[in-house]
A protein has these predicted regions:
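Phosphate/NTP-binding elements of NTP-utilizing enzymes
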Residues: 1-178
């Protein structure tokens, strides 16, 4: 059985296993559904965010604290937490998950994302929010769904970096991420 997230489906092996035309038709429909699920997951990563308890606690502290620090070990989800929270606030509305106890924004937001250098912001934060920098096919594979990205503007002098992202907020307005 192939992993649902594997990029390849061995169609020949599946067709060989199908003994009748009806079996093949059922299998072809299932393959098409798997492709649709993959496409939805690829461009809606925010829906797949399943935070650890420390991340839930971090997001919840936003109700009382305007400034927070998430300090944790390497590869534990700090970037994912920040990207998710930034995306959720930029999107608003029903993008706030049921477990969310932090601050909610009914109107579009303005957010600033920073890092050690423009290159590190591009390679880490921008990728987490938008998808792989410089790959047009990857636009929308980060935490902000493709269909909600209104426009991005390039940052002069830094290849594949953006200076601003405009996101359609649930209220109908535009959120800005700098």
């Amino acid at each position: 059985m192939q992993n649902l997230h594997d990029d390849s489906i061995d169609i020949l092996a599946i067709e060989t296993a199908a003994s009748t035309k009806d079996d093949r038709e059922v299998i072809e429909k299932k393959i098409e559904l798997i492709k649709q699920i993959r496409e939805r997951e690829r461009f809606n990563k925010i829906e797949l965010y399943d935070p650890y308890p420390f991340q839930v606690k971090f997001h919840g502290t936003g109700i009382d604290c305007n400034q927070r620090l998430l300090m944790a070990g390497n590869r534990t989800g700090k970037t994912q937490s920040g990207a998710c929270e930034t995306a959720i606030h930029a999107l608003g509305g029903d993008h706030y998950p049921s477990w969310w106890s932090g601050r909610r924004f009914d109107k579009p937001t303005v957010c600033f994302v920073g890092g050690h250098s423009t290159e590190s912001v591009r390679d880490i934060s921008q990728e987490a929010l938008l998808g792989t920098p410089g790959d047009p096919d990857a636009a929308g594979t980060g935490m902000i769904p493709r269909d909600r990205i209104i426009k991005t503007e390039r940052k002069p002098g830094v290849p594949n970096a953006v200076s601003v992202v405009m996101v359609r907020h649930a209220s109908g307005g535009t959120s800005y991420i700098y």
